Amino acid sequence: MEGSPAGPIEQKEARWESSWEEQPDWTLGCLSPESQFRIPGLPGCILSFQLKVCFLPVMWLFILLSLALISDAMVMDEKVKRSFVLDTASAICNYNAHYKNHPKYWCRGYFRDYCNIIAFSPNSTNHVALRDTGNQLIVTMSCLTKEDTGWYWCGIQRDFARDDMDFTELIVTDDKGTLANDFWSGKDLSGNKTRSCKAPKVVRKADRSRTSILIICILITGLGIISVISHLTKRRRSQRNRRVGNTLKPFSRVLTPKEMAPTEQM
């Protein structure tokens, strides 16, 4: 009836309808058909949706950071390289362009954490030349010796992570014919022939010192042999003189007149 006061049931249904109209549209998917008519609001569903919205960006950020830390930013072209004495050796270290402005280096050692850094890019030495192209670090070693045989690493310095590194093993031999790779045929990466490699001054000084020491040892050995031979010859001569002296002593004794008389009577 119009104008009659609403009963308890009518008031309860009116409250449900008003609370249902106040719910936002994005909560409709969280409510089951039964709950849409029985429960005016579900704070737990709203909270779970908010947690999902906040968790997704954090999860994606964690995945990106993990990929950045775990992925190989530096990759060596070959794990084993061969060359020969007084020739050049080159290595190409490919890296992600993201690390273009990061310092790169070339180091030597079996363990990556204890390798000795030889040179930083773009600096070079008389023995090692580094060239950074933006996505490759090209290392060229010249005037190789057998002492250069060992393990080498390309490295990228990173501020908030461990340095990314990759290794190669260099084997230097004397025989040029044993090389099977044209990459080590005495040409650099640009195709030009490398300059003739001469032994460094330090090596020359070492060779001269070795030869001088060898000559001194030979002279000392010769003098020792000569002195021993002369000593033996003198000893033999003295022994011969003693033997001759002992044989001549009985005949060199002077005879007295009494001893000479019997000999004359005979």
Curated annotation (Swiss-Prot):
Keyword Glycoprotein: yes
Main location class: membrane
The keyword Transmembrane helix belongs to this UniProt entry's keyword annotation: yes
Topological relation to the membrane, as annotated: Multi-pass membrane protein
GO molecular function: transmembrane signaling receptor activity
Keywords from the named record: Glycoprotein, Membrane, Transmembrane, Transmembrane helix
Residues bearing attached sugar chains per UniProt: 192
Cellular localisation: Membrane
Xref: InterPro entries: CD300_family_receptors (IPR050671), Ig-like_dom_sf (IPR036179), Ig-like_fold (IPR013783)
Tissue expression as described in the entry: Expressed in the lung and bone. Expressed at lower levels in osteosarcoma tissues (at protein level).
SUPFAM superfamilies linked to this entry: Immunoglobulin
A GO BP entry: response to wounding
GO cellular component labels: membrane; plasma membrane
Region (Disordered): 1-20
Segments traversing the membrane: 55-75, 213-233
PANTHER family (UniProt xref): POLYMERIC-IMMUNOGLOBULIN RECEPTOR, TRANSMEMBRANE DOMAIN-CONTAINING PROTEIN TMIGD3
The protein's name: Transmembrane domain-containing protein TMIGD3
Organism for this UniProt entry: Homo sapiens
Gene this protein is translated from: TMIGD3
